[in-house]
Amino acid sequence: MNKTVKKIGKGVALTVAGVVGAVTAAVGGWIVFSRKYIQHDMPLDKALEAERQDFLSQHAGRISYYADRSSKGTPLVLLHSVNAAPSAYEMKPLFEHFRGQRPVFALDLPGFGFSERSDRLYSPLLYQNAISDFLKAVIGKPADVVALSLSCEFAALAATHEPELFRSLVMISPTGFNPPRMDKMASRAKARGSRSKLYAGLAVPVWNRPFYDLVSSRPSIQYFLNQSFEGLVPEHFVDYAYQTAHQPGAQYAPTYFLSGKLFTPAVRETVYQALDRPVLVIYDRDPYTNFEMLPALLRECDNWIGARISPTKGLPHWEAPQRVFKTLTDFWSEL
């Protein structure tokens, strides 16, 4: 009996050792492949066919933005989402539709696109300051701001601290409306330092870029975009996301995002409810966030309006553009 147990134990140990060895070899092989064969300085085209300029933010460094100043009126400022491979390209349908009708601006947020991608601390405060600095220095008058997904939190932070910079705020598929049980889980994770530990693990130089290369591979980008589209993802959307993810320093900001450090705890109660500017939320279904608590906020806050554009999955301005354009125009016409 003892011999049998020993043989089984030895077999299990050898199997585990073999699996560990295979995994280690695979990881090591991918690290080598990433360093030697994946291009990290691809030519990067402009995200939009418009004038591109740089602005030096006191708090956030060099920020790239696209502008069409051919018409007068209330400035429209577009803020892309934050994920593994975002850029101003995400806001292209809105930029193209409203250009020529009013001044339109689309930013590459810090760490993305043509903006500065240095190895530094990326935080909600950094993005809040980047937005505020841009609105003060480049726009110079109250603007209509349209933000996508997590950037809604950054825009809301800026609007609560300096409301005079905003005429209105539009949130497309915003984060921050998870049910209380999920907020509590996130708060406990932060209290335990889980996010910091995850960031520390992901940011180890030897595998930080190789890990990001996995997340930003073409199949990975295609997969995640498929989750956000009702219908087919435009091929050029995938192409540009891949381009912008293969630039020097492209891994730094997404590492903070992937470790959960760019989300503001209890943003609904501490930030969203404090907004005093007109707010429009455009939403439907989204695989990456939850709108369970949105109806309650719409009931509580008279300055908030919700518009459900169905069927869409997170990028309604791509999936149902004409309906989104009309919803926006109707909202702004009432201001």
Name each region found by the language model.
Residues 2-78, 99-102, 140-141, 333-335:
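Alpha/beta-hydrolase fold catalytic core
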Residues 125-143:
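Conserved acidic catalytic loop of the alpha/beta-hydrolase fold
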